[in-house]
């Protein structure tokens, strides 16, 4: 997707809050916006339309 590896890591290495869908750092244990503890890793593959 991205043109070089560093950009891809910067874009995709995130955690997503399951409650408010905020982007968080990959080392986060709770959401920065709402404090929710359940985070999922951002999807690495694009979804089919």
Curated annotation (Swiss-Prot):
Gene Ontology MF annotations: structural constituent of ribosome
HAMAP family reported in the protein's UniProt record: Ribosomal_eL40 (MF_00788)
Superkingdom of origin: Archaea
GO cellular component, one term: ribonucleoprotein complex
Residue ranges that the Swiss-Prot or TrEMBL entry lists as coiled coil: none
InterPro entries attached to this UniProt entry: Ribosomal_eL40_arc, Ribosomal_eL40_dom, Ribosomal_eL40_sf, Ribosomal_zn-bd
Record's keyword terms, sorted: Ribonucleoprotein, Ribosomal protein
Keyword Ribonucleoprotein recorded: yes
Species for this entry: Natronomonas pharaonis (strain ATCC 35678 / DSM 2160 / CIP 103997 / JCM 8858 / NBRC 14720 / NCIMB 2260 / Gabara)
UniProt key word ATP-binding: no
Family stated for the protein in its record: Belongs to the eukaryotic ribosomal protein eL40 family.
Name of protein: Large ribosomal subunit protein eL40
GO aspect biological process, one term: translation
Matching SUPFAM superfamilies: Zn-binding ribosomal proteins
Pfam families linked to this entry: Ribosomal_L40e (PF01020)
